[in-house]
Amino acid sequence: MEKLKEFRGIKEHLGVFREAVKDAERIGFAGVPGVCTPFAQLFAYAVRDKDNIFIPNTDFSKARKLEVTEYGVELGEISPGNVDVLVLLGGLSMPGIGSDIEDVKKLVEDALEEGGELMGLCYMDMFARAGWYELLDFDCVINADIDGYVLRG
């Protein structure tokens, strides 16, 4: 994979994602419940004009609609159905809490429409560190690094 663009900050992060999925109609975010759910909600809000679902781990049968409400984006009713973009969230590749790569491959096969795009959305190069670039045929990966500090008065 080759680096096409660099970005800085959450606004640009959401912007590059929005650009990457601009032609999509139905987007599936697959990730670890609790860890990845808020990221799916955040990125689904950035593309709230699309039909978005959250897939817990790799259990496609439990996919739930990501609905925009007065509180933001919330999990709605069960809403399985193929997607034209499948976004794998980085938590799936994390040791100890992630999913087996064979289960991820099955999800890709089951959930992604023919001709659809497989996207990775992660932090701190999780997919590279897990060796997933060699195991999955990503069309696009959006990675961000988090730097931070703590101040006290």
From Swiss-Prot:
Alphabetical list of Gene3D superfamilies matching this protein: 3.40.50.2300
Pfam families for the chain: DUF2124 (PF09897)
InterPro entries attached to this UniProt entry: UCP004962
Family listed: To M.jannaschii MJ1183.
Protein name listed in UniProt: Uncharacterized protein MTH_862
Organism per entry: Methanothermobacter thermautotrophicus (strain ATCC 29096 / DSM 1053 / JCM 10044 / NBRC 100330 / Delta H) (Methanobacterium thermoautotrophicum)
Organism placement in taxonomy: Archaea, Methanobacteriati, Methanobacteriota, Methanomada group, Methanobacteria
